[in-house]
UniProtKB/Swiss-Prot annotation:
Plastid recorded as keyword: yes
GO cellular component, one term: chloroplast
Pfam family name, one: DUF2647
Protein name: Uncharacterized protein ycf68
Organism phylogeny: Eukaryota, Viridiplantae, Streptophyta, Embryophyta, Tracheophyta
Gene name of the record: ycf68
Keywords associated with the record: Chloroplast, Plastid
InterPro entries hit by this protein: Uncharacterised_Ycf68
Cell compartment(s), UniProt: Plastid, Chloroplast
Superkingdom: Eukaryota
Length: 75
């Protein structure tokens, strides 16, 4: 399983950890263990994002640039 990470808040050391699982992307945070996001890429209506708990979700900026970089790096 390929893992990747990117800085979510530069200067604060918060990273998002991404990994691909059966055609979807799991996103976790190194700083907030309650943050969990799962992006199903194979839905007929496009990607489906499932979020679970945490203050990170209150920030409207979920770094899709990280996901784009991850997808282009893992194919």
């Amino acid at each position: 399983m390929a893992y990747s990470s990117c800085l979510f808040e530069p200067g604060f050391g918060t990273e998002l950890i991404l990994r691909r699982i059966d055609g979807a992307i799991q996103v976790r945070s190194n700083a907030d263990p309650t943050f969990y996001s799962f992006v199903d890429l194979g839905g007929p209506g496009g990607p489906v994002v499932i979020h679970h708990g945490s203050s990170l979700l209150e920030n409207p900026y979920i770094p899709y640039q990280c996901m784009d970089g991850y997808l282009s790096g893992t194919g």
